[in-house]
Amino acid sequence: MLSPLALALSSNAAHADFRVCNATQSLVGVAIGYRAKSGWVTEGWWHVDPSTCKTLIEGALSSRYYYLYAEDAERGGRWDGPVNMCIAEKEFKISGVQDCFARGFQRAGFQEYDTGEQASWMVQLTDEPTTAGGNAGNATGTQ
């Protein structure tokens, strides 16, 4: 299992967003889940090249909790967690997290990130081994 690290952002960040940085040497596909006004939503795939970052949500964060799932497109590893949500093989935006298979989707375990009252958040995906109990995740935000 691969490890996500969440890094703190300085309080003078230029803009608010939710970003994922890929600190590996492989292409990574990323999916995000969150609660919208209409209910649960999952979206993917963002392709994040090695040693780059990609913004998944632009602007100030409107939810406190966000959920990430990512796959190493070249070596087959993944960054996952205990929260089951729906995904699809191709680009997707799925409403709801129940009955994934019955609705023609796949199910994956997402890692939860509590962004608190932060306006910005960044997760860094690394090759580092995970600690007991799951993936390590460091997240920071700015107000």
Give the predicted meaning of each segment.
Residues 62-68:
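Short, Lys/Arg- and Gly-enriched loop/turn segments at beta-strand edges
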Residues 12-21, 25-29, 35-55, 59, ...:
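Intrinsically disordered, low-complexity segments enriched in small/polar residues
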Residues 1-8:
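Bacterial N-terminal signal peptides
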